[in-house]
């Protein structure tokens, strides 16, 4: 929130450090071209923009269901957590402040009452894991996706870390049996 941002800024000044949010989309060649075209008036005046951020099911289950952003208390709204760069791009593109913004969604599907019959609390012990589109075993072990977030200590292999995470860690939990709110 705003008060927390002021505290971060004060701490940075006290430590002689700089804190900045980098909105890198402004500097991508494709977006620069879009900005040039819009600014030229070639397409007329922009009246409204509809923008969709497709987070994707793998990222959703990794970050917002099993992961560190799985509770409202430990997270920011999706617009801030995932879309601040998009919002910056749109305001930069249009040279205007936003008048109205809508965001739709919620944490309504990954709940115990929606769990498949026979599901277990951990994917590696689940009888429906092979057919589950949200399988942690498939995501991390078979496809090796999102494993760059796993810390691999000296003397351990990534395979050992994935196995331990699947058997004991947050990322091995069934999406329907997590503590996300």
PLM features: residue spans?
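Beta-strand-loop-alpha-helix segment that lines the small-molecule cofactor/substrate pocket
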Residues: 1-26, 41
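Predominantly a Rossmann-like dinucleotide-binding segment in NAD(P)-dependent oxidoreductases
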Residues: 17-18, 25-171
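Glycine-enriched catalytic-core subsegment of oxygenase/oxidase enzymes
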Residues: 177-181
């Amino acid at each position: 929130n705003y008060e927390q941002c002021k505290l971060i800024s004060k701490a940075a000044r006290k430590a002689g450090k700089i804190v900045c949010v980098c909105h890198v989309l402004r500097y991508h060649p494709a977006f620069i071209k879009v900005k040039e075209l819009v600014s030229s008036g070639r397409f007329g005046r922009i009246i409204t923009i509809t923008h969709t951020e497709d987070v994707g099911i793998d990222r959703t289950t990794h970050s917002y269901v099993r992961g560190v952003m799985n509770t409202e208390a430990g997270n920011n709204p999706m617009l801030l957590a995932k879309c601040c760069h998009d919002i910056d791009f749109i305001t930069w593109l249009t040279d205007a402040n936003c008048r109205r913004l809508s965001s739709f969604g919620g944490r309504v599907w990954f709940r115990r009452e929606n769990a498949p019959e026979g599901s277990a609390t951990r994917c590696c012990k689940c009888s429906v894991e092979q057919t589950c589109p949200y399988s942690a075993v498939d995501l991390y072990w078979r496809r090796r996706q999102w494993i760059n977030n796993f810390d691999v200590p000296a003397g351990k292999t990534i395979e050992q870390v994935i196995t331990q995470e699947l058997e004991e860690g947050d990322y091995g939990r069934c999406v329907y049996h997590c503590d996300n709110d």
